[in-house]
Amino acid sequence: MKAPNMETITESLEKSMMNCSLNDRRRRVVGDGFGRSSSNEHMTPISDRTLELNSHLSLPCHWEQCLDLKTGEIYYINWKNGMRVKEDPRKVMNADPDSGDSYGTVCSEEDSSYYDSEESSSESSPSSRENHKEEEEEEEEEEEEEEDVLVVAGCKACFMYFMVPKLVEDCPKCAAQLLHFDRPHSASS
């Protein structure tokens, strides 16, 4: 039995990829189902479709826009109450503002604190806004670094070494206090 050459394999893969296109709603099996087809078969071109995502408009609080890859339909999920709808909550709210708060933008204090801080900083001068933003970003980066960095630590109780996050103080095996090798320790400890 002769092994197929590279050209045959490439052609077969290209035809298989055309058959599995996400844009083509009709699933076809060409030829024997392995991408091999008779010479008289030809592929129909895939039509171009445009889908407006309205990405320049922000969604109401707790809403997320999703795409169903099987059907190609866009739907929206409200993560606060689990509601899944096909209508764009931005359009529904603009059309009927008295429709209740099923699509509402009511945010908790926790959610709105972000917007409050943005509003108050926009009232100040641009340079102070930039400085404030830079300070916040630096603090967040330092906190993330502290949480993400793994260090070597040893346990005097169970005589084991561990790679643990920098902020972990207790042995994962026996819960005794760890000796971190990334920190200077006094001679008494």
Curated annotation (Swiss-Prot):
Gene3D superfamilies linked to this entry: 2.20.70.10
Domain WW per the UniProt entry, residue ranges: 57-91
Keywords: ATP-binding, Helicase, Hydrolase, Nucleotide-binding
A GO biological process held by the record: cuticle development
Entry's transmembrane regions: none
InterPro entries: WW_dom_sf, WWC/KIBRA_Hippo_Reg
Disruption phenotype: Increased cuticle development leading to ectopic cuticle biosynthesis in trichomes.
Motif range (EAR): 50-55
UniProt biased composition (Acidic residues): 108-121, 135-148
GO molecular function terms listed in the Swiss-Prot or TrEMBL record: ATP binding; helicase activity; hydrolase activity
Keyword Iron-sulfur assigned: no
Distribution of this protein across tissues and organs: Mostly observed in roots, flowers and siliques. Expressed in cells differentiated from epidermal cells such as trichomes, stigmatic papillar cells and guard cells, as well as in tissues undergoing abscission and dehiscence.
Segments of this protein annotated with the region Disordered: 90-148
Function, in words: Negatively regulates the cuticle development by interacting with the HD-ZIP IV transcription factor HDG1.
Complexes and interactors: Interacts with BHLH122/CFLAP1 and BHLH80/CFLAP2. Binds to HDG1.
PANTHER family referenced in this protein's UniProt entry, alphabetically: BOMB/KIRA PROTEINS (PTHR14791), PROTEIN KIBRA (PTHR14791:SF29)
Protein name: Protein CURLY FLAG LEAF 1
